UniProtKB/Swiss-Prot annotation:
<dbReference type="GO" id="GO:0045893">
    <property type="term" value="P:positive regulation of DNA-templated transcription"/>
</dbReference>
<dbReference type="Pfam" id="PF20719">
    <property type="entry name" value="Med16_C"/>
</dbReference>
<comment type="function">
    <text>Component of the Mediator complex, a coactivator involved in the regulated transcription of nearly all RNA polymerase II-dependent genes. Mediator functions as a bridge to convey information from gene-specific regulatory proteins to the basal RNA polymerase II transcription machinery. Mediator is recruited to promoters by direct interactions with regulatory proteins and serves as a scaffold for the assembly of a functional preinitiation complex with RNA polymerase II and the general transcription factors.</text>
</comment>
<keyword id="KW-0539">Nucleus</keyword>
<dbReference type="InterPro" id="IPR021665">
    <property type="entry name" value="Mediator_Med16_N"/>
</dbReference>
<comment type="similarity">
    <text>Belongs to the Mediator complex subunit 16 family.</text>
</comment>
<dbReference type="InterPro" id="IPR036322">
    <property type="entry name" value="WD40_repeat_dom_sf"/>
</dbReference>
<comment type="subunit">
    <text>Component of the Mediator complex.</text>
</comment>
<dbReference type="GO" id="GO:0016592">
    <property type="term" value="C:mediator complex"/>
</dbReference>
<protein>
    <recommendedName>
        <fullName>Mediator of RNA polymerase II transcription subunit 16</fullName>
    </recommendedName>
</protein>
<dbReference type="InterPro" id="IPR048338">
    <property type="entry name" value="Mediator_Med16"/>
</dbReference>
<dbReference type="Pfam" id="PF11635">
    <property type="entry name" value="Med16_N"/>
</dbReference>
<keyword id="KW-0805">Transcription regulation</keyword>
<dbReference type="InterPro" id="IPR048339">
    <property type="entry name" value="Mediator_Med16_C"/>
</dbReference>
<keyword id="KW-0804">Transcription</keyword>
<keyword id="KW-0010">Activator</keyword>
Length: 955
């Protein structure tokens, strides 16, 4: 026998260069960092989602050491107006709750406000976004669960909320214009009868658990064992859960490589619960499990070739399947945005992956890295043996229950490792992410790859219209944004990377394709409409609009959004619908955000109009709710915090009305010399950019001004009949009354002025023959393009020559002229710019804030602190900042009183700004604040009962 050393292998080279061994091994392509660990995680346990993007816009991810959860979000940077990912904020309550156990899985609920965190021992803790995206409070502690390896979570799903939302099926081009197909989408159960949160989990030992909240916001739990055919089936590795019309569909994969399917029903006793009628000790709803159709199972195999297309189909070499392991299991539902309802049966999708490194002894290394196996869930007749026909039946016409079957569909092969399968864009797109960072969009029905060139006249999703993710090796964990315009990836070193979808917008090869450009705008519009209808955060869409679209394309998008939702901008008659219109603030918000440049630069004129209308709407709704919540006899008819907010908004509303009048008086003086030349008047008007003039001409903003006057009149009259007040409430209400009493114009005189403007606008429409069908056009021109349409030029002439002069005798013009309106932030003068640089105004309370240290450069802040003889911690003031408009709120805690909490919750301002953007707590600047150990935005305690009771209904 020859010695091993006789084959020419030098022992000195054994640990040297591999090429010197001359073993004939081909060099292997280096795999991404952490891929082997990622594949092992996916093989061993079904719940290993390390990063998740909620529908409210919060991105939560597990740190590299597996002991912490950090959160980030998209935000507009105040200094330069650029949209970026925020700095990370660690959630210390998660680390404390799990006591050093490795965190393995994250999952947001459907509204995107509550987060479930699971560790390696199957313990689950639950948290909720309280007042800001980076302020998350604990609801359920992980200590409630035992420390048991058999309790590891292999599948998890939140119960849906019971609410009907508006949705959109598609956009189709009809006669050169896009037509959008809206419909009302009903929710899919099961639901919690109290509309509280519920979380369904499947454990490794085959136990299904339901964690649910009682009406008092405390968590309870029930559990049951899934029916199995053998002991080995109880050791589960993966489970997929999804809500269907027939109950919860559960697919499990066991250690013996068997896939089973279950239908789980959750029955509540009692089925309904009304807190207004139930009196203690009436029982709260208690759930129980019922299992149906538990016999569907399939022995999994990965064929060497596509068995449905003949031998060696698609040119694939044959390979063995003994080394393929399941690394992913999902259930794909038909598209939810379907006006006819979801009629198709769901699909079960499994990922089978080959080992990352194989030896020469196994020829299967020539096979694909991943095989995606799909089964269609079908219902078929239950066939019996013919001998059963001879058995007499005791029941005539006995109906045989249908049988559920799993029908194998064509497999999908890939030479890359599939690391994630996500159903996005409301079920219209299946996104598969591979180990090299590439993302491929598929049609869930056919598994055909979207290429963006199939049909330029029909748009069902962004992917179908040609949006795609360029190749980028950025990570092994991925989560898509609420509207799939962006994705965030987590790499092997625990770093996050933001990725945006891209589109050519018709610019290809130096030419312009109008069809592709139009389809891209329609796809963005469709995504925005779906987000508005489902009450989903749309910052990812705004990010695409700001970064990728020209101002002309942005204007096209805004016009499409107003037409698609649809929004009739004419409110000369139906003004009451304006207060509760769900889409108007959404459109105004994104319109205002597109014109934001930075904190110190004025907005564009076109975006300043919707920004002002948003402020008018806030004051109008505030006054309406103030009177609503103070009706009838109550122990505390007026809350000091509410009155302080009413006081600030009253001062703002009055100053805004004075600012409008002051501007109109100046315009009347400028146009006085042109009273006899209508042509010159019209030409000068075209070159005039006056925000107050547009606000008065627009029926929407004019209606809000009338609502504000009605509210101010009611507050003024109610002071005399108000219940006896004490303390701060008396001081605030007295100041409100005194502010109205000393105003340079009476409320009734201002209402008379608005009536004169309304009359001038109506006469202009009537004179031009514009009826209700023609008026939305010029009204939209005012609101969207900030231009005075030709039909309203006579109205402007009447206002400046007749309405404004008639008001002079009823006002104190000197006081209005000398007023300081810089704090409104609406002018472009030097005084307003200086105020904007030095002070902030609470956007909710309309009260000037103290200069915040975090908003100043650190050197200047420290210098100011030294000059005042105070430490930095004494001058620092924590605040919330809107991630969209960059305005601030001084409230960093939930409202203290019930009335104040109900008011803020009804206004929708617990987590969101007046503009609709989400709040974020500003980070700490000084080391003295950081040395305390708790970062800014940390809610270390449990959510108070008052807060927990109202969070579910706010957004």
């Amino acid at each position: 026998m020859p010695l091993i050393m006789e084959d020419g292998i030098n022992v000195d080279d054994l640990f040297g260069e591999p090429g010197s061994l001359e073993l004939g091994l081909s060099p292997s392509t280096p795999s991404p960092r952490g891929l082997a660990q990622r594949l092992d995680e996916m093989r061993l346990i079904g719940c290993c989602q390390k990063i998740a993007w909620s529908k409210l816009g919060c991105i939560a991810y597990i740190s590299q050491d597996g002991l912490r959860v950090n959160v980030r979000h998209l935000q507009c940077r105040p200094s330069d107006g650029k949209w970026v990912l925020s700095e990370e904020t660690p959630l210390l309550p998660v680390t404390d709750a799990h006591g050093g156990h490795t965190l393995v899985h994250l999952c947001w609920n459907e509204p995107g406000a509550e987060l479930a965190v699971a560790d390696s021992s199957g313990r689950v803790s639950i948290y909720s976004i309280s007042i800001a995206l980076n302020s998350i409070a604990g609801h359920r502690q992980a200590a409630f669960d035992p420390d048991d390896d058999g309790a590891q979570i292999v599948g998890m799903m939140w119960l849906n909320t019971q609410r009907t939302v508006h949705s959109f099926y598609q956009a189709a081009k009809v006669q050169g214009r896009w037509a959008y197909s809206p419909f009302r989408r009903r929710p899919i159960g099961p639901f919690h009868p109290v509309n509280k949160a519920g979380l369904v989990c499947v454990t490794r030992s085959g136990i299904i658990r339901l964690l649910y909240q009682n009406p008092d916001s405390r968590w309870a739990e029930i559990s049951a064992e899934l029916k199995n055919t053998g002991y080995s089936d109880r050791l589960l590795t993966h489970a997929a859960l999804v809500s269907t019309q027939g109950g919860i569909l559960v697919a499990t994969h066991s250690a013996c490589q068997k896939i089973c399917l279950y239908r789980v029903h959750i029955a509540w006793t009692p089925t309904q619960y009304d807190p207004g009628q139930q009196k203690p000790p009436a029982p709260w709803p208690v759930p129980s499990f019922r299992f149906l159709h538990c016999k569907v199972e399939s022995q999994c195999d990965v064929p060497g070739t596509n068995r449905n297309a003949g031998d060696n189909a698609q040119g694939l070499p044959s390979f063995t399947n003994s080394f393929y392991c399941l690394t992913g299991l999902d259930i794909v539902l038909p598209a939810l945005d379907n006006p006819a309802g979801s009629t198709a049966n769901p699909w079960v999708v499994a990922i089978y992956s080959a080992p990352l490194h194989v030896t020469q002894d196994h020829p299967q290394q020539q096979g694909p890295a991943s095989v995606i196996v799909r089964w269609q869930l079908d219902t078929g007749p239950l066939t019996l043996h013919p001998k059963f026909d001879d058995v007499p039946s005791k029941k005539n016409n006995a109906q045989v229950k249908p049988k559920l079957e799993l029908r194998r569909l064509d497999d999908v092969y890939s030479d890359k490792y599939a690391i994630s399968i996500d159903q996005i864009e409301y079920g219209n797109v299946l996104a598969i992410t591979y180990d090299d960072g590439s993302v491929v969009f598929y049609d869930p029905k056919t598994m055909a790859v979207f290429n963006g060139v199939d049909d330029a006249n029909t748009v069902t999703s962004l992917a179908q219209a040609g949006f795609h993710h360029p190749p980028e090796p950025s990570g092994l964990h991925i989560s898509f944004s609420p509207n799939a315009c962006a994705a965030v990836m987590l790499d092997g070193e625990g770093q996050t990377h933001l990725r945006l979808t891209e589109h050519s917008y018709g610019a290809e090869g130096g030419l312009h394709d109008e069809n592709k450009y139009s389809a891209a705008i329609a796809a963005l519009t469709l995504a925005f409409c779906r987000g508005c209808g489902s009450d989903v955060n749309t910052d990812d869409i705004l990010l695409i609009l700001v970064r990728q679209l020209t101002p002309e394309a942005q204007a096209t998008f805004i016009n499409e959004a107003y037409r698609a939702l649809p929004i009739n901008c004419n409110f000369t008659v139906e003004q009451d619908k304006l207060m509760n219109h769900p889409y108007i603030p959404r459109c105004l918000s994104i319109q205002a955000a597109l014109g934001f440049k930075n904190k110190y630069t004025p907005r564009s004129f076109a975006s300043s109009i919707p920004w002002a209308v948003l402020q008018l709407r806030h004051a109008s709704v505030l006054y309406a709710f103030f009177f609503q919540y103070n009706k009838g006899g109550a122990t505390e008819p007026h809350d000091p915090d509410v009155l302080r907010m009413v006081l600030g908004n009253t001062k703002w509303a009055l100053d805004f009305s004075f600012y409008v009048l002051n501007e109109l008086f100046d315009l009347a003086d400028d146009f006085e010399s042109l009273s006899g030349d209508q042509e010159a008047f019209t030409q000068k008007l075209k070159s005039t950019s006056s925000l107050p003039l547009i606000i008065l001409l627009s029926s929407m903003s004019r209606a809000f001004l009338r609502f504000i006057c009605r509210g101010l009149r009611g507050i003024y009259a109610g002071y005399a009949t108000a219940a006896p007040l004490s303390g701060d409430a008396r001081v605030y209400y007295a100041e409100i009354y005194q502010t109205l009493e000393s105003a340079p114009i009476r409320i009734d005189a201002y209402e008379k002025f608005l009536a004169g403007v309304d009359s001038a606008v109506r006469h202009a429409y009537h004179g031009a023959g514009f009826g209700d069908a023609e008026r939305p056009g010029p009204e939209k021109e005012l609101l969207v393009n900030a231009r005075v349409p030709p039909v309203l030029v006579p109205a402007v002439s009447t206002i400046l020559r007749q309405t404004v002069p008639a008001l002079k005798t009823e006002i104190d013009r000197i006081t209005i002229y000398m007023g300081d309106y810089s704090w409104l932030g609406l002018s472009n003068d030097r005084r307003t710019e200086m105020y904007r640089r030095n002070r902030d105004v609470d956007i909710i309370k309309k009260i000037p804030c103290r200069p915040a240290a975090s908003a100043l450069p650190e050197t200047n802040a420290n210098a100011n602190a030294n000059q005042n003889g105070k430490s930095s911690t004494q001058v620092q003031q924590r605040r919330r900042r809107c991630v969209r408009c960059c305005e601030v709120s001084s409230d960093t805690h939930p409202p203290r009183s019930l009335l104040s909490f109900r008011m803020i919750a009804k206004l929708g301002l617990l987590r969101a700004c007046v503009c609709g953007g989400m709040w974020t707590l500003e980070p700490s600047v000084y080391s003295s604040a950081q040395s305390s150990g708790a970062p800014v935005g940390q809610a270390t305690g449990r959510t108070p009962a008052l807060m927990a009771a109202g969070l579910a209904g706010s957004s």
